[in-house]
Amino acid sequence: MYARFFALVSLFAFAMYLLVVSDNLLTLYIGWEIMGLCSYLLIGFWYGKESARKAGIKAFITTRIGDVFMLLGLAALYSLTGSLGFKEILSNHAVLDVLATSVSPVFGLSWAGLIGLLLFIGTVGKSAQFPLHVWLPDAMEGPTPVSAMIHAATMVSAGVYMVIRFFPLISAGWVPGEALTPTMSVMAFIGAFTALFAATIAMAQNDVKRVLAYSTISQLGYMVAALGIGAYTAAAFHLATHAFFKALLFLGSGSVIHGMEHGLMHTGETLDPQD
């Protein structure tokens, strides 16, 4: 059991490192998918428990919906530019200008806007934004260190990180101080709505880890909303600062649950330690 747990946690961390250090979208996507696999295996770690099995499958299927659209965005970007390298695309103003001015056949969006929107749908799944947020509260079925990792260091952070990394492409054609592009408007609306509705749901929860889960969804909504209005520096800052306190909150909640369970063995009271 311990060997399986630490092997999966190490692979999870490796996938996030691969995503962060990659210099092209292909290796980023490989790390992205390895994380999706590890989340399924770790959320369903207690596979003898039916609720844990169902939570793992739910997380895997929900995030795959976003990943399909992200893969379409990668394919469109490669077919138009012939490259998936960050330097070749994001540092090349000529390429960005062509993508921002050429019109795609979908809703009259520019190719930069369409590709940005497809990549953002991947983030909606990975970073648990509305309407693909449903997997994250159930991810509490995994061991507490896994919850802390998913909510702070890996998984949900990956989606926001990817949008920050690709902000020059997503915001191509936008001039600060002027009207937002359609893709940025969608990001701002989804982020703001998610931030409000998840915080409202959190107030009605009585399970300590579910309160923290909805809190994470809300905070990620703030980050996405900031990216939608062009404040990517603020989003990156909030992503880094949020990770520290949310990891500590989850580890602290796990310690409280563990301690109360030991106390209940002596008192015999029928109190839910997570309540």
Language-model features: locations:
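...captures the hydrophobic TM-helix bundle architecture rather than a specific catalytic motif
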Residues: 1-275
